[in-house]
Amino acid sequence: MTYRKDLIASLIRDVPDFPEPGVTFKDITPLLANPNGYAAAISELVDTASRDVDVVLGMEARGFMFAGPVALSLGAGFVPVRKPGKLPGDVYSQSFVLEYGSATLTVHQDAVQPGSKVLIVDDVLATAGTVRATASLVEQLGAELVGVSVLIELSALGGREKLDRAGIGPVNAVLTI
């Protein structure tokens, strides 16, 4: 690994049995609290991202912390993908299954112009439910998904393979665990 990746990895804490038994939560709060670590994470995400991007979509809540700075670095807009009831006006919705439950994501129907090139940025790729739901929202918006960038890929959960089978990608991860 590189110095930046080593720094990032050292600032991610494993929390066993959270939010429920059998799940190991990747706690990024030490990373976010360390300015050098946070900057390294953003730099690594930007380095793996497509340069031909109009809009970066980030998912609530931890995806926001990475997608916004990545969008600024790429000279692109940032669009939040939120839980139901958090966005005023007309939205597209997509439900999905998580590693430990189910959820729904929404995006404003006018958030992205049709034909725009979209990059999805999130903190963790686990079972791919969140990314697949967001990719579906990109399709509903009439935009073009040009890539997915995540801070951490939990390879044992097979998210990348699910995205490959669904034709979603390319997928880039800063750390693969």
Swiss-Prot record:
It is an enzyme of class 2 (transferase). It comes from the Bacteria. InterPro entries: Ade_phspho_trans, PRibTrfase_dom, PRTase-like, UPRTase/APRTase. PROSITE patterns: PUR_PYR_PR_TRANSFER (PS00103). Its main location: cytoplasm. GO terms for cellular component: cytoplasm. It holds the Pfam family Pribosyltran. Keywords: Cytoplasm, Glycosyltransferase, Purine salvage, Transferase. Its EC number is 2.4.2.7. One of its GO terms (molecular function) is adenine phosphoribosyltransferase activity. Transmembrane segments: none annotated. It catalyses: AMP + diphosphate = 5-phospho-alpha-D-ribose 1-diphosphate + adenine. One of its GO terms (biological process) is AMP salvage. Disulfide bonds: none annotated. It is found in: Cytoplasm. Pathway: Purine metabolism; AMP biosynthesis via salvage pathway; AMP from adenine: step 1/1. NCBIfam families: apt (TIGR01090), PRK02304.1-3 (NF002634), PRK02304.1-5 (NF002636). Belongs to the purine/pyrimidine phosphoribosyltransferase family. Homodimer. Catalyzes a salvage reaction resulting in the formation of AMP, that is energically less costly than de novo synthesis. This is Adenine phosphoribosyltransferase. It comes from Cutibacterium acnes (strain DSM 16379 / KPA171202).
